[in-house]
């Protein structure tokens, strides 16, 4: 199995880390049958690749063997964004019969976290994602990993995301705050339903907590009241963090 080094790991603040822990926890409550999860968005640049990557990282950090599949065959940014180097094979190589699965799966320097990169842009992305090899790929990964996170193209641009979502156990829709209208989001939800996809929920991304001042102040107050005394006494905060994620979910 080839190995790549992830050189540009994002440093997340406390709120963001807790948000991913909450998302991770919510996914675990969907049940053991929901292991292949696709993530899509309405339009480009809503942050779906970052959410996919950080969610997969969070699952791996929790001890879950996780693989991130970059199925955005038209405009992938994963390798460039995280400066992983030059992998030899990717998803498009496998789907077109130019490589085997073991050639395309890359081990990373993060324990329990593997990646399948998109590979070079093919002339027929939709046809490749709709062929039997992609179905077989997900079935094989399901037998090997606890979670398979699939980053897909925006549904408002091309049909690829719906094709992948149909092969997944469930789909999460990423919505950029103050950018996507209710009508646009409903249109995407309708597309997923017509394609027979199961929508697990939505993630509101790029929220400006300074504008949402009331929530931000509440969170800071809650954080201090929950952790303040323990931090002063030097207690281990790992367990309260889990409890905080549960509380936030409510």
Where are these regions (language model features)?
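Inter-motif core of Ras-like GTPase G domains
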Residues: 143, 155-178
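Hydrophobic micro-sites
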Residues: 1-6, 186-250
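Switch/connector loops and helix/strand junctions flanking conserved nucleotide-binding motifs
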Residues: 77-78, 124-126, 182-183, 209-214
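Hydrophobic residues in beta-strands of the RecA-like P-loop NTPase core, especially within AAA+ ATPase
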Residues: 150-152, 204
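P-loop/Walker-type NTP enzyme "switch/lid" segment
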Residues: 2-21, 25-32, 41-46, 53, ...
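Walker A (P-loop) ATP-phosphate-binding motif of ABC ATPase nucleotide-binding domains
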Residues: 36
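Aromatic pocket-lining residues of Rossmann-like dinucleotide-binding sites
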Residues: 59
């Amino acid at each position: 199995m080839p190995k790549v080094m992830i050189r540009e790991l994002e440093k997340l603040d406390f709120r963001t880390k807790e948000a991913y822990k909450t998302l991770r926890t919510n996914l675990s409550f969907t049940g053991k049958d929901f292991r292949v999860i696709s993530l899509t968005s309405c339009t480009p640049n809503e942050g779906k690749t970052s959410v996919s990557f950080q969610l997969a990282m969070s699952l791996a950090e929790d001890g879950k063997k996780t693989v991130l599949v970059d199925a955005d065959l038209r405009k992938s940014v994963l390798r460039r964004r995280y400066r992983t180097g030059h992998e030899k094979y990717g998803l498009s190589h496998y789907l077109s019969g130019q490589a085997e699965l073991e050639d395309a799966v890359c081990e990373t320097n993060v324990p329990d976290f593997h990646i399948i990169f998109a590979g070079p842009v093919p002339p027929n992305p939709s046809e490749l994602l709709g062929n039997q090899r992609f179905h077989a790929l997900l079935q094989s990964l399901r037998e090997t990993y606890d979670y398979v996170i699939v980053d897909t193209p925006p549904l408002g641009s091309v049909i690829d995301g719906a094709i992948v979502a149909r092969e997944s156990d469930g789909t999460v829709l990423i919505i950029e705050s103050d950018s996507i209208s209710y009508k646009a989001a409903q249109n995407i939800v309708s597309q997923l339903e017509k394609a027979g996809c199961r929508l697990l929920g939505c993630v509101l991304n790029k929220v400006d907590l300074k504008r949402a001042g009331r929530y931000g102040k509440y969170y800071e107050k809650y954080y201090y009241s929950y952790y303040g005394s323990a931090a002063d006494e030097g207690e281990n905060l790992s367990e309260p963090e889990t409890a905080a994620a549960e509380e936030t979910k409510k």
